[in-house]
């Protein structure tokens, strides 16, 4: 039986800065669980499979089942449902909150964070399985049970037409389908032994075969040895030898972009292809519409299925790749040009090792994690670097009733915990949540980054880190502007509470360090991006080679990061008014100007990291309020509130489809369904802006929805996918289903009913 292990190490090849606090891995025990418990898990899995085309998102039922044994649910107040035109009372809302808090306390890990599913993208696991197959480590790292659950996951998320999408709710794409098909074959699923595999192969061939895969798909197929490198657009490692002053220099790109193309360029530069085996030879024969020997590889370079085309290549880009492919690469592949290639490869692998070591081999994300691991093996199959990579694979795997998936990060630990603290404090029910806050404080304190990366930061293209907070764990360590800000906000909230209740506050100097990082992020336009200040120009997007994603080349400022930083600095300024007061005031003022400048004509803001306009508008409103704007004095705030009110559904809630993110147009969920997380974001924004003084009716209607949606055990339902990145790929934030209804009802109880 599977069990979730928290804050445990993984043997002599692993290191940690804080005793693995935040690490979450799933382990299988052949003798674990009673027959009744195993039967209960089987029933959860079977139920998901039965409903898989209607309910795409898992509910983290296996984790919840484990916690129900480890942390039994305490007695709950009697549940109250509001009927008809009954009014909400403080008593009803308080009972609902106490029920929610008591349940929420049962799913908190011992180290203080709340574990949860961060899956959704379908293109992550294939890279892992392909890499492990190439390196011969597939069955070393992935037990038979791992492989069984991975297959379960992939089959569960196959669309009716036989294909797989970019993410679990998306339409079928060649990227999702061909990589998933290859993955299942590498996991010993026969091409014709399963009807699902037959349908998948038919989908691939009906849509043009392997040559119609987008560039990232072609890369993985070429590395596996079933696609010719001459059919892949160039990824020259020599780009890293260019001077930094050039806008196209990779070190000036968004860190996620450069961290993926850095190891890709190493594999491409070496033209590494895994030797064919009987299995990969069979796969190669199954995925092309013409015999492999007859494929026109030059034509294949520019081929991409229309289902995958979110960002078609401009002509300028195709011309550049053709020139590099036909004129430059032949020179670099032969002496004396090969001398330059060897120098570039040496520089690239040096950077890869630096990145690995500074994240304890977690790496910044799952895509570059597995390509970095492949590079280390290609360089030296017996290297310590490769051995250090292997145990960290488990950090990315998550199990739910839909199977085992590869997550979009090694978790959302700090991010969710910082939000959770603010949600818990909003309820003012400290008698219920004191223990949770104390454990959460422990997690936040242990997860702060307390040093910059080693060496010359400019040489390694790293931003300062000391004092920041990461998205997940300290061992991961990449600092992010909004994570630092939410970590700072949570720390300030905790410092205002009794030390006897939550523990000693984080020392002021460490908060000063965080402020120093936040101040360093602001760009000349007042906006703040994610990991670093913006280093190059938006026109560089013309060179975006990834047909499936938008806005990936540079680190763009966004309303969420800017607002989070403004809110954090304003909160810090209230507690420490003398510390760098002029710089903080300037940053807040310029951030506020940016927020107003990027507001859309309808009053909304586009959310880059959540679905979508509801999320962005919550941040936009909160940022302007933190900067000192008010509803009566700010047209921006009035327009934003009008936008939110215009999208409220007859049910009292808000419900926004992921299509809003993809199409950049507000789109309701199918059937005008309300989403509890969208509803909570809208409530928080409207409550903060003073809606209770104008007309509290919309807030009352929304709060009734949240009260009535609560389960008997105090939990809330998992609904449609609510996270997004790069405009077109959706991702799960499973903890939001608890955090935001608690936060919204807490604010409603104290600021609306208590008004």
Swiss-Prot record:
Disulfide bonds: none annotated. Pathway: Secondary metabolite biosynthesis; terpenoid biosynthesis. GO terms for biological process: pentacyclic triterpenoid biosynthetic process; tetracyclic triterpenoid biosynthetic process. The active site is at 482 (proton donor). The keyword Nucleus does not apply. One of its GO terms (molecular function) is cycloartenol synthase activity. It holds the Pfam family SQHop_cyclase_C. The keyword Kinase does not apply. It catalyses: (S)-2,3-epoxysqualene = cycloartenol. Its EC number is 5.4.99.8. Keywords: Isomerase, Repeat. InterPro entries: SQ_cyclase_C (IPR032696), SQ_cyclase_N (IPR032697), Squalene_cyclase (IPR018333), Terpene_synthase_CS (IPR002365), Terpenoid_cyclase/PrenylTrfase (IPR008930). SUPFAM superfamilies: Terpenoid cyclases/Protein prenyltransferases. PFTB repeats lie at residues 97-142, 147-188, 390-431, 511-556, 588-628, 637-678, 699-740. The record marks 415, 471, 609 as: Transition state stabilizer. NCBIfam families: squalene_cyclas (TIGR01787). PANTHER family: LANOSTEROL SYNTHASE (PTHR11764:SF20), TERPENE CYCLASE/MUTASE FAMILY MEMBER (PTHR11764). Belongs to the terpene cyclase/mutase family. Oxidosqualene cyclase involved in the biosynthesis of cycloartenol. This is Cycloartenol synthase LCA. It comes from Lycopodium clavatum. The lineage of its organism: Eukaryota, Viridiplantae, Streptophyta, Embryophyta, Tracheophyta.
